[in-house]
Amino acid sequence: TRSPPSTIQQVDPVTDKREYRDDYDDKTLYIPGPTEVRDDVIEAMTEAPFGHRMDRMTDLYTTIVEDTKTFLGTDNDVIILTGSGTEFWEATTLNLVDEHVLVPTCGAFSERYANVAERLGKDVDRLEYEWGNAVKPEDIREALDASDKTYDMVAGVMNESSTGVRNPIEEMGDVISEYPDTYFAVDAVSSLGGDYVDIDAHNIDVIFASTQKAFAMPPGLAICVVSQDAYDREVEKGTSSWYGGFRRTIDYYERKGQTHSTPAIPIMLAYRKQMKRMLDEGHAARDERHREMMEYVHDWADEHFAMFPEEGYESQTVACIENTQGIDVAATIDEVNEEYDMAFSNGYGDLAEETFRIGHMGEHTVESVKALTDAIEDVAEL
């Protein structure tokens, strides 16, 4: 028997198999994702399978790609691939970066973007902020001016769901536009579809998201919007991600109207159904609905607790609330789950008991979010 390499850390198994049952209670999801999915969207996944090289697949894939462009208001290319948005942490780094990356870090997911780039062998400089604070565009300018390096990419997070911070990516993109050799990639996993951003107007070379957040679709697909400059950069660079390469995916779409590899067709059928609903609602109305939910939760938090993020930089899709009353967050979550069949989240990492988080995105409304806050008030005796 071959021995495992000594460089691999050996750990004990975390748990034995826990049998999945058929009788779980349904819970209404107010977590930072996945979020609620409409019954008709779930039903769309039950169509009989068909071949991923059939004309029917071309009809499906071109529909969801072009409808996504329309919804987001972009003339840039759109890629929809099976996988998590995490895939594009790797793909953007491999496609755009020769050596140097600047990552403004202000929470768990921006830090993870930096970690991914380091694992891919890139030279990463961090512009660090205390958790709860937002990235400041002028700090990016100072970092770009002060460095003797030419950064290939600035990697930003639009919506830091670990802290409930919404970073000003529009202004960040405007600053980075002054540095033509530096590309701007944005993780918008927990905000795109629920917080409008004019992608084409603000030098955003790549922006990517996942279906299970504000798009209110089942997990399993990643959406990526790619500028012509980013596409050209990958071609010039000559090396890229195999699975998430811009040239490979976009060229295959232009030639065939399909994905280069077998996709999760049932989830794409659900995507088509939900995107039709999103187009019917309209991005402006959807954005306003999310803003109304944000304002409701903020007013509620101000009455009973406090908002954790820096004022003026609060997320439009995920509220991170400071536990100023010292409630038992874990016990409150469990009791709300048990008594009301509603799920919300504790704080992230070290903030587990200091904060709690409410996902108010996707198909939620002020009325549905109020049902959760009423339940929290009841259980926590606020």
Give the positions of each predicted feature:
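PLP-dependent enzyme catalytic core of the Aspartate aminotransferase-like
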Residues: T7, V11-V14, K27, D350, ...
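A glycine-/small-polar-enriched, mobile loop at the entrance of the PLP active site in fold-type I
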Residues: Y24-T82
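Active-site C-terminal subdomain of aminotransferase-like
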Residues: E36-V37, Q212-H298
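Conserved beta-loop-alpha segment that forms the PLP phosphate-binding cup at the N-terminus of a helix
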Residues: D75-L102, C106, S110-A114
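Active-site phosphate-binding strand-loop segment of PLP-dependent enzymes
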Residues: V135-S191
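Conserved active-site segment immediately N-terminal to the catalytic lysine
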Residues: D200-Q212
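Conserved PLP-binding catalytic core of the aspartate aminotransferase-like
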Residues: M307-E339
